[in-house]
């Protein structure tokens, strides 16, 4: 079974095509409706650690109900969560991050609209901490801190269903994300996927992340096109899911093909 963390403000609904392709290739999938996301109440305050705990709880539940062995996967922010999970858990067979970065990296700010002030990163975080204490629920839409143009650059046909997706994040959550530190040692084979034309998670950022990871084995796999949202495209989703299933089989996961 594969535990899947959705990306920024998304839930499993937006990844239905990719998750269905994984299922068709024989993988059972446990896709997470994280705290404050998807079918859960959106008004609740939450932190990065709360979202990570959702995945750790899912792992424990799945093992308790005989659903092992398990894999980890996540896209974008979900890729960061998958990396954090793989650094905490000793029982995962492999981790597949579809874009990811260490938030504590000095270059992580390059993902955001605050890149011109990279030299002031510590002061920005200190200011953000004060603001998040005073206004923890202040809603910030994605375009307030990320470039939507970069997110959408290079995307192919995208049948995106916005149901149950968030429209903003509370300021307190964003501070918890930007200030968290994710351990670079993961306890299972690690696969980092990224599109060559991703304008958000650029090649230099991905290469730096990959170099920093310590794992029993690690592989960086470049998707030829599709931009940051590549795995939401039906064509890329089908090919990537088949690749993931083949790798999963090599790590001892039984596949149940649905023809």
Regions found by a protein language model. Give the residues of each.
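The conserved beta1-alpha1 loop
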Residues: 3-7, 194-195
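Catalytic nucleophile-loop/oxyanion-hole region of alpha/beta-hydrolase
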Residues: 9-11, 38-66
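Serine-hydrolase catalytic-loop signature spanning alpha/beta hydrolases and amidase-signature enzymes
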Residues: 9-17, 29
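Conserved alpha/beta-hydrolase
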Residues: 19-41
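Alpha/beta-hydrolase-fold enzymes
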Residues: 77-169
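Short beta-strand/loop motif that positions the catalytic acidic residue
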Residues: 186, 192-194, 198
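Conserved alpha/beta-hydrolase "acid-adjacent" motif
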Residues: 199-205
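Catalytic histidine-centered segment of alpha/beta-hydrolase-like enzymes
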Residues: 226-236
């Amino acid at each position: 079974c594969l535990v899947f963390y959705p990306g920024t403000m998304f839930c499993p609904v937006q990844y239905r095509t990719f998750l269905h392709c994984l299922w068709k290739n024989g993988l059972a999938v446990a896709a997470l409706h994280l705290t404050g996301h998807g079918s859960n109440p959106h008004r609740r305050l939450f932190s990065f650690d709360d979202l990570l705990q959702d995945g750790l709880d899912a792992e424990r539940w799945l093992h308790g109900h005989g659903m092992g062995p398990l894999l980890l996967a996540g896209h974008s922010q979900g890729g960061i969560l998958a990396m954090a999970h793989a650094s905490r858990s000793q029982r995962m067979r492999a981790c597949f991050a579809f874009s990811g970065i260490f938030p504590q990296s000095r270059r992580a700010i390059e993902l955001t609209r605050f890149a011109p002030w990279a030299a002031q990163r510590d002061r920005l975080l200190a200011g953000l901490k004060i603001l998040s204490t005073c206004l923890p629920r202040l809603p910030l839409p994605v375009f307030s801190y990320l470039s939507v143009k970069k997110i959408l650059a290079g995307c192919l046909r995208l049948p995106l269903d916005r149901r149950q997706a968030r429209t903003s994040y509370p300021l307190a959550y964003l501070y918890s994300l930007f200030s968290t530190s994710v351990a670079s040692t993961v306890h299972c084979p690690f696969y980092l996927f990224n599109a060559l034309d991703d304008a958000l998670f650029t090649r230099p950022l991905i290469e730096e992340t990959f170099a920093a990871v310590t794992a029993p084995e690690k592989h960086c796999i470049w998707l030829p096109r599709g931009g940051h949202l590549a795995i939401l495209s039906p064509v890329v989703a089908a090919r990537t899911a088949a690749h993931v299933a083949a790798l999963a089989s090599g790590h001892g996961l039984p596949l149940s093909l649905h023809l």
